């Protein structure tokens, strides 16, 4: 579609005077610079980021009406991807067509990407083992577990709205602990919930039994070939494979960036690209940056494949966030109105919550084994979790990570 045709996406002034708000006239560089500023100020996670966008672009400048913004937010919360970034892309399209959407999305993500890229490079220039900095990162890793636990709670509050969604989440968590692949549990969870919403309980039971049978068949087939597969995939990190890993995570981030954690970890740690300790360090670094937390994928890509790997992973993770708005701009609101599709996505999202819970247990076990003192590690975890709930501020994550690093430096000297 040409840029001229894309301008038709903008409502007319007459429409603005009667029913709808309109973005102000601006050039493409001005649009990019505006969202670059938002990216530089994107502290505090999605809630703070969305609040910033709402305050400036809805309440103050009326790029879009409050009612339509709320509906747009509801759509973005159903679809995979970081909501704040997707809203930026959508508003960029509203202002200057699809090219405007690309520029708005790039502006919002670029500061976080460049900062994480620089930190990833610095991470490998510094000695950690047996140093005070290594000890500080042990403290930080305990705090990261607290961040994930709080995220599971907050995401679950918005997704697990009835008993069946709770059941799906618990079953998917148990299945993940039992090493059942997500490509079995998540579609099954979505189908089962959609059928239950339609009151087709017999069909839901059949889908459940089919999923159990498939999981058993895969387990039986995989058992004799597991060592062969492990030998093939261990350490391999081609650019295409890194990109595919990021794309998979980007397509499955229902409910926020934290939901990408189990999928990225499954590939990065499972394939031998990095250790769990490095994975937790990447999460910690992303927590102190003005960016969507999913920017930790840049660090994972850097560890797996250097600078090119960092770019490949980042492109893969963010591609769905661009694509949904760019391709389906006019039809996104229909997602909320389609009850069957909405129910399926709700079931998948509930399953993802279960996967995060299972991954949190795994990461907590790894951290417990790494810290020199389990008591001190648990104390840092408990203090960080309590602070996150007690202090409602967009910088609370940054403060917790820095404080945990200081605590690790003080109590785990030369233990990194």
Swiss-Prot record:
Family: Belongs to the chromate ion transporter (CHR) (TC 2.A.51) family.
Any single biological process term in GO: response to chromate
One Pfam family, short name: Chromate_transp
Function of the protein: This protein reduces chromate accumulation and is essential for chromate resistance.
Region listing for Disordered, in residue ranges: 1-21
InterPro entries hit by this protein: Chr_Tranpt_l_chain (IPR014047), Chromate_transpt (IPR003370)
Transmembrane segments: 99-119, 128-148, 160-177, 181-198, 204-224, 237-257, 283-303, 308-328, 341-361, 371-391, 395-415
Molecular function terms from GO: chromate transmembrane transporter activity
Induction context: By chromate.
Protein's membrane topology: Multi-pass membrane protein
Keyword Membrane: yes
Subcellular location: Cell inner membrane
Cited NCBIfam families: 2A51
GO CC terms of this entry: plasma membrane
The gene coding this protein: chrA
UniProt entry keywords in alphabetical sequence: Cell inner membrane, Cell membrane, Chromate resistance, Membrane, Plasmid, Transmembrane, Transmembrane helix, Transport
Protein name: Chromate transport protein
């Amino acid at each position: 579609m040409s840029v001229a045709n894309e301008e038709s996406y903008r409502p007319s002034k007459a429409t603005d005077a009667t029913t709808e708000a309109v973005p102000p006239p601006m050039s493409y560089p001005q649009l990019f610079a505006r969202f670059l500023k938002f990216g530089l100020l994107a502290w505090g996670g999605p809630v703070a980021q969305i609040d910033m966008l709402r305050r400036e672009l809805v309440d103050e400048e009326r790029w879009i009406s409050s009612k339509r913004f709320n509906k747009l937010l509801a759509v973005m919360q159903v679809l995979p991807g970081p909501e704040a970034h997707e809203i930026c892309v959508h508003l960029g399209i509203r202002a200057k067509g699809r090219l405007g959407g690309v520029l708005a999305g790039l502006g919002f993500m670029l500061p976080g990407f460049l900062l994480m890229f620089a930190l990833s490079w610095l991470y490998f220039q510094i000695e950690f083992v047996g140093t005070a900095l290594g000890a500080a990162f042990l403290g930080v890793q305990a705090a990261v577990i607290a961040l994930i636990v709080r995220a599971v709670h907050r995401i679950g509050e918005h997704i697990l709205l009835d008993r069946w969604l709770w059941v799906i989440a618990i079953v998917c968590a148990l299945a993940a602990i039992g090493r059942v692949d997500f490509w079995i549990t998540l579609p099954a969870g979505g189908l089962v919930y959609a059928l239950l919403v339609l009151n087709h309980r017999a069909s839901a039971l059949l889908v459940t039994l089919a999923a159990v049978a498939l999981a058993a068949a895969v387990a039986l087939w995989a058992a004799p070939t597991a060592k062969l597969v492990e030998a093939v995939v261990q350490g391999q990190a081609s650019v295409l494979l890194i990109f595919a890993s990021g794309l998979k995570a980007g397509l499955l981030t229902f409910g926020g960036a934290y939901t990408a954690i189990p999928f990225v970890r499954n590939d990065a740690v499972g394939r031998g690209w990095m250790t769990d300790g490095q994975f937790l360090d990447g999460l910690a670094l992303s927590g102190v940056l003005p960016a969507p937390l999913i920017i930790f994928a840049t660090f994972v890509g850097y560890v797996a494949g250097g600078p090119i790997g960092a770019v490949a992973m980042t492109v893969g993770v963010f591609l769905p966030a661009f694509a949904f708005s760019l391709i389906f701009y006019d039809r996104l609101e229909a997602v909320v109105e389609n009850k069957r599709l909405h129910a399926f996505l709700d079931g998948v999202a509930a399953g993802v919550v279960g996967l995060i819970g299972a991954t949190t247990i795994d990461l907590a076990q790894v951290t417990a084994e790494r810290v020199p003192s389990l008591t001190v590690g648990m104390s840092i975890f408990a203090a960080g979790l309590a602070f996150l709930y007690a202090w409602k501020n967009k910088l609370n994550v940054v403060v917790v990570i820095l404080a945990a690093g200081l605590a690790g430096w003080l109590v785990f000297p030369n233990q990194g």
